[in-house]
Design a protein with these regions (language model features):
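Extracellular/oxidizing-compartment recognition motifs
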Residues: 1-226, 233-234, 250-253, 266-284, ...
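Well-ordered alpha-helical scaffold segments within catalytic/enzyme domains
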Residues: 170, 237-248, 295-312
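Hydrophobic core segments within long, regular secondary-structure runs in both alpha-
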Residues: 202-205, 209, 249-260, 297, ...
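Aromatic- and histidine-enriched alpha-helix N-cap/loop-to-helix transition segments
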Residues: 226-236, 247, 287-298
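Charged, long alpha-helical assembly modules
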Residues: 275-308
């Protein structure tokens, strides 16, 4: 892995793979000895509270369009959060670029601006550009082939929000069988269901549920593409609903700790947790608006009312 970033994507060079490096029989005598870290990480080491990220669904594309020579756009038929998985065979060193978007232009080409990272909209300066950032922070993954028969790959340390996948650099012409959409989210246990005699209500519920799961990874986010921030106001708005449908206990314990970790010196709470500098119409000192600050106390009340857990209050 040459780069991984939840906004800019992952870059993977399969030529650099070390075969069997994780097996006890591997000869690591040429490896250098580890060195102690001069300044260790701060804070207290604790167990991970949130559920692991799992594959929820594998979505096959419904059509492929060659928008320009060597540029192919795959339509998954629905919006989702996750990554693309490719199956490819080609020469060593072939570089495949995958970009993601929620819409296409009238000519069928990918509209990457529908899912660029919101806090990176402007052109990067020279120093940032040299670090590998593109002029526009679109969602992009890169895979470099090792050239050893069929290769199957998907990013491991990023996720995107998208419906359309653009592929360039493919050796030859891909088919619908070469690309899959891997839908991801936190592995929340289902605790409730909804159905009614009204199909419109049923469809609305399915859309709401699908949207919610697209926004639960390490935080309960506002969107899986542009920002991916854990806004307190968004949590206050929907947490009660989804406590009926999923076991949100550990996920919300983690969210409370996130807000506690970023509490401001004057006592206020940030608009997002983890804190990223956003303080729209806050009270100063980096605090967020009152409705967003309420997430800290509101979630503690939710844990008590829905799960009988008063430990975090105590």
């Amino acid at each position: 892995i040459l780069r991984n970033n939840v906004y800019l994507g992952e870059k993977y060079d399969a030529r650099k793979e070390i075969k069997d490096w994780d097996k006890p029989t591997f000869n690591a005598s040429s490896w250098k000895q580890v060195l102690p870290v001069p300044t260790p990480p701060q804070g207290k080491l604790t167990a991970q509270m949130q559920p692991p990220i799992r594959i929820r669904e594998i979505i096959r594309p419904t059509r492929m369009t060659e928008t320009r020579q060597g540029e192919f756009v795959f339509d998954l038929g629905q919006n989702m959060a996750g990554v693309a998985r490719i199956k490819v065979k080609g020469p060593k060193g072939t570089r495949i670029t995958i970009r993601y978007g929620e819409d296409v232009y009238s000519d069928g080409s990918l509209n990457v601006m529908t899912s660029v990272a919101g806090q990176h909209k402007t052109v990067w300066n020279a120093n940032q550009e040299s670090a590998g950032a593109p002029p526009t922070a679109w969602q992009e993954d890169t895979y470099i082939l090792k050239g050893e028969g069929e290769e199957i790959w998907m990013p491991q340390f990023t996720f995107h929000g998208f419906r359309y996948i653009e592929v360039t650099g493919w050796p030859g012409r891909p088919t619908l069988d070469n690309i899959e959409g891997i839908r991801l989210s936190a592995d929340l246990k289902v605790t409730g269901e909804f159905s009614s005699s009204n199909e419109l209500l049923n469809r609305l519920h399915r859309v709401l549920d699908y949207t919610f799961l697209s926004n639960v990874f390490s935080v309960e986010s506002d969107c899986p593409a542009r920002e991916k921030f854990g806004y307190g106001g968004d949590i206050v708005g929907v947490s009660r609903t989804f406590c009926y449908f999923y076991d949100m206990h550990n996920f919300y314990v983690k969210a409370i700790r996130d807000f506690a970790n970023d509490q401001r010196p004057l006592g206020g709470f940030t608009e997002t947790a983890p804190y990223n500098g956003i303080a729209d119409q806050g009270l100063g000192d980096g605090s967020g608006p009152i409705g967003w600050q309420l997430a800290f106390a509101f979630l503690q009340k939710q844990l008590y009312e829905y799960y009988g857990d008063k430990r975090i209050i105590e």
